[in-house]
Regions:
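Small-residue hinge/turn detector
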Residues: 157-167
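Active-site acidic Asp-centered loop
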Residues: 167, 172-173
Length: 339
């Protein structure tokens, strides 16, 4: 289009972040990390983390400024299927394939719970073998994935926003556990995802639980959970996130921060799409169950959690062999779903 430019948008880590990474390695780490009091080291790491987020915000803002002036040529994802306009679809992805016996136990639990609570929604489980039936990605996306410059986690960002833009429905990570049917109110919204609630009371509890993801510090720009997203077809926030991730991966071979997409979302809804932002429901809610996953099972505690939310973000990355499993919430769900 007229006025569009071919320009590279490179992301760079902050100077403080680069220095910090150097100091954490030999030979400096013996002085920097080992001899420094833990509280001081942790405080420095938080400030470095915020500094790097600030640098990422600056890089995203450069792209956003050109994007909203229609100055960027963007590669397209091509949809391959057609669905009925009123068809409600649940999308899931597991790159290694859905052979049940090969799934991690946590994913097996979520798999069976999804089958139980899918209701009358069309459930489409994707893997690397069948995504081509639904979407055609730009060559550079698949090339960077095959060369392992892009990991599955960040390829999944492109996949989820492509599916939601072109088909709509609800994206649900393979590690999302349902304990009831999906709330119908979320399907009625133009889009919905869980976000950071500034009025949440037990902030310290969650910052101690996961200091990388959870923070209510004003410097933090990571404020959304992408593991479950409801969206109507052609939602402009989903479309914009997809466009800008395609620009990022066109010009970059590595991520500046694991949550760089979440930082982009914050910039979009706080600066460009304020009126279009979905209502804020605390992203602590889907984490409540996994926070106690390896604790002693309590029927009362489970009821309290599931009364407040039916959508739970789990993880298969924690080595359960190193955790107490007997009589835990984990064991309860394993037994419930006969795993």
């Amino acid at each position: 289009m007229k006025g569009q430019i071919m320009k590279e948008y490179k992301f760079t880590a902050s100077t403080i972040y680069k220095l910090n990474e150097k100091l954490k390695k030999k030979p400096f780490k013996y002085i920097y990390k080992e001899l420094m009091p833990n509280f001081l080291f942790d405080k420095i790491q938080r400030e470095v983390y915020f500094s790097n987020q600030k640098a990422i915000v600056s890089d995203w803002d450069k792209i956003l400024a050109d994007y909203f002036k229609d100055k960027i040529e963007i590669a397209k994802v091509i949809p391959k299927k057609k669905f009925l306009n009123d068809e409600k679809i649940i999308w899931q992805f597991w790159g290694q394939g859905w052979d049940y016996e090969n799934l991690p136990n946590v994913v097996k639990i979520c798999y069976r719970a999804m089958n139980k609570y899918r209701e009358n929604y069309t459930l489409i489980r994707l893997d690397m073998e069948n995504i081509g039936e639904y979407l055609e990605f730009p060559d550079y996306v698949m090339k960077k994935l095959s060369e392992k410059k892009m990991g599955y986690a960040h390829f999944t960002d492109i996949l989820r926003f492509s599916l939601l833009k072109y088909y709509g429905g609800v994206w649900i990570d393979a590690t999302i556990l349902l304990t009831d049917y999906l709330p119908s109110e979320y399907f009625k919204m133009d889009y919905f995802l869980f976000q950071r609630d500034g009025d949440f009371k037990n902030k310290k509890e969650f910052e101690l639980y996961d200091s990388i993801y959870f923070s209510w510090n004003k410097k933090s720009k990571i404020k959304m959970l992408s593991s479950i997203i409801f969206s109507h077809k052609d939602n402009k926030i989903m479309a914009t996130l997809l466009d800008l991730l395609l620009v990022f991966w066109r010009d970059n071979d590595k991520i500046p921060n694991y949550f760089f997409m979440q930082i982009l979302y914050t910039e979009l809804v706080e600066k460009y799409y304020k009126k279009d932002r979905c209502k804020i429901v605390s992203d602590t809610l889907p984490h409540e169950l996994f926070k106690v996953w390896f604790e002693t099972y309590s029927k009362e505690k489970l009821k309290k959690i599931t009364d407040s939310v039916s959508i739970h973000k789990l993880s298969f990355k924690i080595d359960s062999s190193k955790k107490k499993v007997e009589n835990t919430f984990f064991e309860y769900f394993k037994n419930l779903y006969e795993i």
